[in-house]
């Protein structure tokens, strides 16, 4: 299983929230001018929305929109959180038939102050992921006994 812990911006969730991403879309893939649907990579068989089973109990399950830059305005695709890497990881896992789990810490509101908020919230994200990781390990040990 490939596990991605990372940071995200969101218009839907408050800073400090950890979410479990189980759907992934490319938020900046737009070749609609060539007749393709928003989010579709031309001449690929991969669907624009990738979905994986939810694996993090107790966390909100969300759709993640990945792209190449910080979001500071309204999005053209529907997603709950925004990052720069999860879709690519999900795509590789789909191509390789690997399981994929993704948890994100909301560092910013995906707005004009996203870059500054992201930077100042990184230490909180690291601490939150350490706690999440330790709880997953403890739960796994309990499940084995």
Where are these regions (language model features)?
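Glycine-rich phosphate- or other oxyanion-binding loops that anchor nucleotides, phosphorylated ligands
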Residues: 1-144
């Amino acid at each position: 299983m490939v596990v991605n812990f990372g940071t995200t911006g969101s218009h839907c969730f408050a800073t400090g929230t950890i979410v479990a991403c189980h759907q992934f879309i490319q938020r900046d893939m737009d070749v609609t001018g060539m007749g393709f649907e928003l989010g579709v990579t031309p001449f690929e068989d991969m669907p624009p929305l990738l979905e994986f089973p939810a694996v993090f109990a107790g966390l909100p399950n969300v759709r993640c929109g990945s792209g190449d830059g910080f979001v500071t305005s309204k999005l053209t695709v529907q997603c709950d959180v925004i990052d720069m890497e999860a879709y690519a990881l999900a795509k590789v896992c789909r191509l390789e038939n690997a399981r994929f789990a993704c948890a994100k810490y909301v560092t910013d509101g995906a707005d004009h102050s996203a870059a500054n908020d992201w930077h100042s919230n990184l230490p909180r994200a690291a601490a939150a992921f350490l706690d999440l990781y330790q709880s997953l390990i403890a739960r796994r040990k309990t499940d084995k006994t």
